[in-house]
Every structure is written in C-alpha cells, then in structure tokens.
C-alpha cells in the first residue's frame, strides 16, 4: 500500500510552480539553454517557454536571465530559492505521508 500525492502551487487558480516547472528550471541550470533543456525533457521549446513565462508573470519574478554567452540562460537567485523551498516542501510532505502510510498499513 502507498499513499500517492502531487504538489503544486497556484495563484488565482493558475499554476505558478510544481514538479514540472522545477524540472524545467533544473534542466536549464544544467544545460544553460532553454532549447537544450526542452529537448532533454522531451518537450517542445514552445511548451517549455510557455510554462516558464507563465510562472514568471504569475509570480511577478524573473526566474532566468541571459548569460554572458549568446543565447545562454542562468537561473536567478530567486529561482534557486523557490526550487530549494519547493524541495523542502516535498520532503516535509513526504515525511508526513510516510508516517500516515505506516498507520494505514496497520489498519489494512
């Protein structure tokens, strides 16, 4: 038996951050390119760009900035903070659910 969950953050009923956006930002951090990140994730550039821009607009924060090399992208310090806090949130929820799972296993 397992308890399943998904976490995302909404503002005014619209997604601003979740596992998908987290994955996109981490791929950008590794690749320094939205195009390369999208390819790595099996997404179109347009889909990755759309999610990134939607999050930036809804948060009213820049998540990426242009690098020194042409067309390179880097995460902003705010993006890194958001990723860090999201990972902590995931870990906290995981710990709570792990305890709940143990309790439910006793009942079933």
Label the model's feature ranges:
Residues 82-104:
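Alpha-helical linker/hinge and terminal dimerization helices associated
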Residues 1-13:
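Short, Lys/Arg-enriched N-terminal segment that forms or immediately precedes the first helix
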Residues 51:
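Residues within the DNA-recognition helix of helix-turn-helix
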Residues 66-89:
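Basic, amphipathic "hinge/linker" alpha-helix immediately C-terminal to the N-terminal HTH DNA-binding motif
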Residues 46:
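Key DNA-contact positions within bacterial/archaeal DNA-binding proteins
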Residues 24-25:
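Short alpha-helical "packing" element that flanks the helix-turn-helix/winged-helix DNA-binding module
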Residues 57-62:
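Residue cluster at the C-terminal edge of the helix-turn-helix DNA-binding motif
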Residues 29-38:
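Short helix-boundary/capping micro-motifs
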């Amino acid at each position: 038996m397992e308890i399943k969950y998904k976490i995302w953050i909404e503002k005014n009923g619209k997604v601003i951050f979740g596992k998908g956006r987290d994955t996109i930002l981490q791929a950008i951090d590794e690749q320094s390119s939205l195009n390369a990140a999208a390819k790595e994730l099996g997404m179109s550039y347009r889909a990755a760009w759309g999610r990134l821009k939607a999050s930036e607009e809804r948060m009213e924060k820049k998540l990426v900035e242009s690098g020194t090399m042409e067309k390179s992208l880097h995460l902003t310090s705010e993006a890194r903070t958001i990723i860090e806090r999201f990972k902590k949130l995931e870990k906290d929820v995981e710990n709570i659910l792990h305890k709940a799972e143990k309790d439910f296993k006793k009942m079933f």
